[in-house]
């Protein structure tokens, strides 16, 4: 959760909270790339980032909702070109760390929680899951 404090549910499957320190879109992108070991692209809204919404997968279209809930930026897996343009124009930062990159890191935690919830069912996390894309 990027060290977020005061975390609340966001958009059903995401979270919104306060970062330990104010940062920039680039600083957040660098921290995300290091934490997840992925490539990160960002649209810099040009404002300091303290409150962050996080949603795995494809949630670029949720940036308006994130902004309405007081977030300064949204970190997600996929963001369209036009979502990035609109958010940037509105002074809101969007970061895209890849669909795979934002979902696979939590797969083990989900498997553990499912196993605890359903002890009579054997839960197995796939080890063959891979990002379908190749990167330069």
Segments (PLM) and residue ranges:
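Hydrophobic structural segments
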Residues: 1-136
